[in-house]
Amino acid sequence: MTMFLARHFTPGLLALDVLSASAAERFPLVWPTPSKGWAENRPPAEWLQHAGSGDPTTGGFGGVRTGGTRFHEGIDIKPVSRDRHGAPLDPVMAVSAGVVRHISSAPGNSGYGRYIVLEHPALTPAIYTLYAHLAKIAPDVREGVSVTTGQVLGTMGHSSGGYMIPAARAHLHFEIGLAATRDFQAWYDRRRMGGRNDHSMWNGMNLLGVDPVAFFNEWRAGRLAQPLDFFHRQETAV
């Protein structure tokens, strides 16, 4: 049984707090797991979880699977510790202060499995972050509550809906992005999708993710006073 030993996971904070002397000028940002692979510039193969092919790039962002026909709107981060049964022990942490907007605790209700969405209203714009395939959700994490940077949200796992993720490939699916509309339910109803929307506006169809690694890289380089700086640098899709 996984225990939530601390409200904040200090080592995860320290790994990023010391990245730059200018950190105080930017919004706080921490990596969502104890993995130090990104912070220490290790090869992605050491910290990205492949999707079954053995190719670590399939755990990255973008058209990295099925010959580019399937878009992966986040990154998949490997665990760094497991129990004697092989289950991940890694805590999953809020990358920045925010509000819990959605918790899907029934894995079968989404391909994300058991997942949490945070909104970060103190940032410009108010981005969302998503934490998926969780094994457990921390008992003090509930919809509507505020969370702090580095607060433990749950435990990494391999929960899913409609397909199976083997325990050996357990990971955190992590997203950063923007919600397309706050009127998603009305759009969903007009489209007559044929099924119930259990996730309000935090349904994956309404979430527009950006590359989390690129976002973190820009932050580390001191080029993001606010997330808006990142979006200003994105190429226009035509």
List each language-model region with its residue ranges:
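Surface-exposed, glycine-biased beta-strand/turn segments
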Residues: A23-R114, H199-V238
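Zn2+-dependent peptidoglycan hydrolase active-site motif and core
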Residues: A87-L89, V95-A138, I165-A167, H171
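N-terminal export leaders
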Residues: M1-T10
